[in-house]
Amino acid sequence: MDAVLSVQGASAPVKKKSFFS
């Protein structure tokens, strides 16, 4: 999951922030 989150974050930092929020 970490790898997926890392890729998603790098591709879409906004989406990552939303996921974490």
UniProtKB/Swiss-Prot annotation:
Designated gene of the protein: traA
Family (UniProt): Belongs to the TraA family.
Assembly: Monomer. Interacts with itself to form filaments; also interacts with TraQ.
Top-level taxon: Bacteria
Name the UniProt record assigns to this protein: Pilin
Predominant localisation class: membrane
Propeptide: 1-21
Lineage: Bacteria, Pseudomonadati, Pseudomonadota, Gammaproteobacteria, Enterobacterales
Region (Disordered): 1-21
Membrane topology category: Multi-pass membrane protein
Database matches in InterPro entries: TraA (IPR008873)
Recorded GO CC terms: extracellular region; plasma membrane
Keywords: Cell inner membrane, Cell membrane, Conjugation, Membrane, Plasmid, Secreted
Protein function: Propilin is the precursor of the pilus subunit, pilin, that forms conjugative pili, the filamentous surface appendages required for cell-to-cell contact during the earlier stages of bacterial conjugation, and that retract after contact is established. Mature pilin is assembled with the help of TraQ and TraX.
Residues that span the membrane, as ranges: none
Compartments in which it is found: Cell inner membrane; Secreted
